[in-house]
């Protein structure tokens, strides 16, 4: 497992305690299956934290099985932005998940999965308490300015503005298509 995954234990424990929840006195074992697939990233923190809260009786553990959770937990209990939310939500939708709890800062990107009105219900939260409230059906405060737009309207120059330099333009197109750096 990556260092980020190994550090998640402390992030989750501190986040739960600093949010006013108890943490189990006994050892907590979390199985991330399938074991043969390498786990990396902090996007599993929220799912693990909610699993612990469900096991401790803070939430209905059976109801939690129907909800997808994405997000990193800070030491203070905030639910932090993660990368790659859109493909995760699309994968959850394909697996039959109808509700997804995610960081408020990822909401704009996640809403791309709901274009045309389809896709899972999205519950954007800022901290662990809001996450618990959301899964219990309580109203959470509007996100307001906390939500960062995923797509910005920007006017970009394009290659029609450049005369000549055909080899350089072709190299740039190939580099971008392959997600390679240009510099």
Positions of the model-derived regions?
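Peripheral, non-AAA+ core regions of ATP-driven protein-machinery
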Residues: 1-183
């Amino acid at each position: 497992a990556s260092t980020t995954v190994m550090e998640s234990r402390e992030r989750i424990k501190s986040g739960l305690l600093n949010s006013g929840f108890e943490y189990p006195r006994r050892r907590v074992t979390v199985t991330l299956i399938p074991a043969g697939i390498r786990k990396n990233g902090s996007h599993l923190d929220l799912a693990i934290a909610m699993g612990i809260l469900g096991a401790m009786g803070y939430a209905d553990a059976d109801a939690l099985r129907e909800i997808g959770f994405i997000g990193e937990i800070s030491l203070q209990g905030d639910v932090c932005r993660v990368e790659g939310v859109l493909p995760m939500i699309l994968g959850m939708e394909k697996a039959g998940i109808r509700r997804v709890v995610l960081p408020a800062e990822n909401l704009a990107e996640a809403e791309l999965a709901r274009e045309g009105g389809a896709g899972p219900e999205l519950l954007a939260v800022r901290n662990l308490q809001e996450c618990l409230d959301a899964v219990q059906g309580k109203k959470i405060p509007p996100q307001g300015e906390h939500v960062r737009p995923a797509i910005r309207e920007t006017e970009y120059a394009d290659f029609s503005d450049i005369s000549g330099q055909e080899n350089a333009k072709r190299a740039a197109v190939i580099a971008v298509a392959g997600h390679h750096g240009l510099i």
